[in-house]
Amino acid sequence: MARSIWKGPFVDGYLLKKADASRATGRSEVIKIWSRRSTILPQFVGLTFGVYNGHKHVPVNVTEEMIGHKFGEFSPTRTFHGHSADKKARRG
């Protein structure tokens, strides 16, 4: 079930402060965040966030198309190594 419109998008408070501070300094450095549940807002466009995936911070450059999505969608937590080959098919 989607979030109610009257509640508005969820964003951790510290995330807004970090984004505003980064815009004020004008430096393009990676902002490390652990809040995968936060929604990407229009004021984050152009910034680079390091979204934690449980192992490392994955750099995510925010673009217009990402607005409304969650940060966690762009930082996968699992690595797929492929399925094992069918042993019957290999025998010939």
Swiss-Prot record:
Segments traversing the membrane: none
Molecular function (Gene Ontology), one example: rRNA binding
Gene Ontology cellular-component annotations: cytoplasm; small ribosomal subunit
Keywords: Ribonucleoprotein, Ribosomal protein, RNA-binding, rRNA-binding
A GO BP entry: translation
HAMAP family to which the protein is assigned, alphabetical: Ribosomal_uS19
Family: Belongs to the universal ribosomal protein uS19 family.
NCBIfam families the UniProt entry points to: rpsS_bact
Name listed for the protein in its UniProt record: Small ribosomal subunit protein uS19
Organism name: Methylocella silvestris (strain DSM 15510 / CIP 108128 / LMG 27833 / NCIMB 13906 / BL2)
Gene for this chain: rpsS
